A protein has these predicted regions:
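P-loop NTPase motor domains
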Residues: 2-17, 25-283
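Conserved oxyanion/phosphate-binding beta-strand-loop segments in alpha/beta enzyme cores
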Residues: 20
Length: 283
């Protein structure tokens, strides 16, 4: 491990020598893996690192698929009054009284080319749905066609049903009539000439299953918002704290996996727009 500095994180103590073991920001910037058997202290180690990051003023995001670590960090932040002087955002899928907004189609800062975002979102959605779009070119084309259209028109996943429904030709033609991307426009021009049965065959059952997942009632309130939605780029730049509880008690396991994957995907795309010297943020 590197020589400790003011920004280094204490990992633990060497059982043989009693020496404190630290990891430096440079080492963490390369990547960090936490490995171990069940009930061997992985979550405790992560909790310790998160607490230190918050104390040091670092930006942090915790995405907890179980909710236990989320609850511990929230209680700790309350106990030590971090809510009073740090920007802390809580996303809790178990809270039925308030649905947070997250639109994975939002562009970040200087991000101009939507192609990379379309590709990454399509892959994330297909993976969670159990589909391999690399071996299913028609499925890949259909998903990317819908996602590109929603992004270019500044829509949300809630509107996907109008693009996918074979008996909604008027709505589909209205939404696709002035697409700026020439290739996407030509594809919709062709799709809009098909009869209902032909259109239904073209998109296929796999695509509909995927759209049904991302437009489920549990996710509709999250993905269906366009204003005051989560801005991962702003959280990173401002050194904010984002705590996410994806406990399946609030949503299904597949919905939890999809939301988690899209959140990680959004952070990854936002990271690509940041400069080397920007404020450190740990996911």
């Amino acid at each position: 491990m590197g020589k400790p500095s003011k920004k280094s994180i204490l990992l633990g103590t060497d059982a043989m020598t009693g020496e404190e073991i630290y990891t430096t920001p440079k080492e963490r910037g390369a990547h960090t893996h936490v490995m171990g058997s069940t009930d061997e202290g992985k979550s405790f180690g992560l909790e310790n690192m998160i607490r230190q990051d918050i104390r040091l003023g670092n930006g942090v995001c915790l995405i907890d698929p179980h909710g236990t670590l989320y609850d511990k960090i929230v209680r700790w932040c309350v106990t030590y009054n971090f809510f009073d002087h740090r920007k802390i955002v809580l996303l809790n899928t178990s809270d039925k009284q308030w649905a947070f907004g997250f639109n994975p189609f939002n562009m970040h800062g200087s991000e101009q080319d939507i192609t990379a975002r379309v590709d990454s979102i399509a892959e994330a959605i297909a993976t969670v749905s159990g589909e391999n779009i690399d071996t299913m070119p028609q499925l890949r084309q259909s998903i990317k066609l819908v996602i590109h259209t929603l992004m270019e028109k500044n829509l949300t996943l809630h509107e996907a049903k109008y693009l996918m429904n074979p008996i909604k030709p008027k709505e589909r033609k209205y939404l696709t009539k002035d697409i700026q991307n020439a290739v996407v426009f030509e594809q919709w021009e062709h799709m809009n000439t098909l009869r209902d049965t032909e259109f239904d065959v073209k998109f296929g059952a796999s695509t509909r299953r995927i759209i049904e997942l991302i437009t489920s009632p549990a996710l509709r309130n999250i993905f269906g918002q366009t204003e005051k939605t989560l801005n991962t780029r702003a959280i990173m730049d401002e050194g904010g704290i984002l705590l996410v509880n994806l406990n399946p008690k609030g949503i299904s396991l597949s919905e939890s996996r999809l939301l988690g994957k899209l959140l990680v995907n959004d952070f990854t795309l936002a990271t690509r727009q940041r400069d080397e010297g920007d404020r450190r943020f740990y996911l």
